[in-house]
C-alpha cells in the first residue's frame, strides 16, 4: 500500500457535471475508505443518487453548493459540510454561473475493487425528478 499520494498520481475522471479525482481507493490499497476530490463546474450538479451500504461526508473546500440530503436542502460554502447517512438520497448542485465548486468527499466502507464507490441513480424517480424543476 502507498502511504503518500502525490497529486500527480490522483486519477481524474471527467463527467458532464464536473470532475472526480480518485484520491484514495481500493486500487491504491484502501480497504475501508474512499476519498475523492470533486469539482462541480458552474451550473453543474451531481443529480439525485444514493450509495447503498455507504456513508458519506462532503466538505466544501471552495465555492458554494446547494446540497440536498433527502428532500432537505442547504446552501453550503467553504468550510461547511454535510453528512449523508448510509443509503440516503442526496444531490449536490453548483448554481454559480462562473465559479467551480471544490469538494472533498469521504465515503465508508469501500465497495468494489476499483474505485470503492457504489452508486444508484434515482434522478428519474419521484419525488427527486420534480424537486429541482
Predicted segment positions?
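Glycine- and acidic-residue-biased ligand/ion/polar-headgroup-sensing regions
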Residues: 53-55, 59-65
Amino acid at each position: 500500500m502507498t502511504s503518500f499520494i502525490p497529486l500527480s498520481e490522483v486519477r481524474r475522471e471527467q463527467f458532464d457535471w464536473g470532475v472526480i479525482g480518485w484520491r484514495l481507493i481500493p486500487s491504491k490499497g484502501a480497504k475501508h475508505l474512499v476519498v475523492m476530490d470533486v469539482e462541480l463546474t458552474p451550473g453543474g450538479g451531481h443529480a439525485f443518487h444514493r450509495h447503498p451500504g455507504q456513508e458519506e461526508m462532503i466538505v466544501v473546500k471552495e465555492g458554494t453548493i446547494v446540497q440536498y440530503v433527502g428532500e432537505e436542502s442547504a446552501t453550503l460554502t467553504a468550510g461547511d459540510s454535510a453528512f449523508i447517512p448510509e443509503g440516503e438520497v442526496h444531490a449536490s448542485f453548483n448554481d454559480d454561473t462562473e465559479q467551480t465548486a471544490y469538494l472533498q468527499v469521504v465515503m465508508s466502507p469501500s465497495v468494489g475493487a476499483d474505485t470503492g464507490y457504489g452508486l444508484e441513480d434515482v434522478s428519474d424517480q419521484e419525488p427527486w425528478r420534480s424537486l429541482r424543476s
